[in-house]
């Protein structure tokens, strides 16, 4: 909608008043879209954003679960291979 982060938070809170799940889903979809917008390639943005708009889909975030809990990793490409660094 082109609004500010504060206004986005207000929309999330308003949705959550009626349904915490709806508020969380809305927020997480927008977080995923923002990550793609900031870091995705042009081709990936075209593919995902057109799917969201044309098919009314939602974006999502996924985390790996190694061992006994959810772990957050940052990936980087070096020496022709993907590498993961634990950040939490």
Curated annotation (Swiss-Prot):
Gene3D superfamilies per UniProt: Acyl-CoA dehydrogenase/oxidase, N-terminal domain
InterPro entries tied to this protein: AcylCoA_DH/ox_N_sf, AcylCoA_DH/oxidase_NM_dom_sf
Keyword Signal: yes
Lineage top rank: taxon: Bacteria
GO MF: flavin adenine dinucleotide binding; oxidoreductase activity, acting on the CH-CH group of donors
Signal peptide positions (record): 1-22
Keywords of the record: Signal
Name of the protein in question: Uncharacterized protein HI_0082
Species this protein is from: Haemophilus influenzae (strain ATCC 51907 / DSM 11121 / KW20 / Rd)
Lineage: Bacteria, Pseudomonadati, Pseudomonadota, Gammaproteobacteria, Pasteurellales
């Amino acid at each position: 909608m082109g609004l500010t982060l504060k206004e986005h938070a207000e929309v999330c809170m308003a949705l959550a008043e009626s349904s915490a799940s709806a508020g969380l889903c809305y927020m997480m979809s927008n977080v995923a879209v923002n990550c793609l917008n900031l870091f995705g390639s042009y081709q990936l943005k075209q593919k995902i954003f057109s799917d969201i708009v044309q098919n009314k889909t939602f974006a999502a975030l996924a985390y790996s679960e190694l061992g006994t809990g959810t772990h957050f990793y940052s990936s980087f490409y070096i020496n022709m291979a993907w590498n993961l660094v634990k950040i939490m």
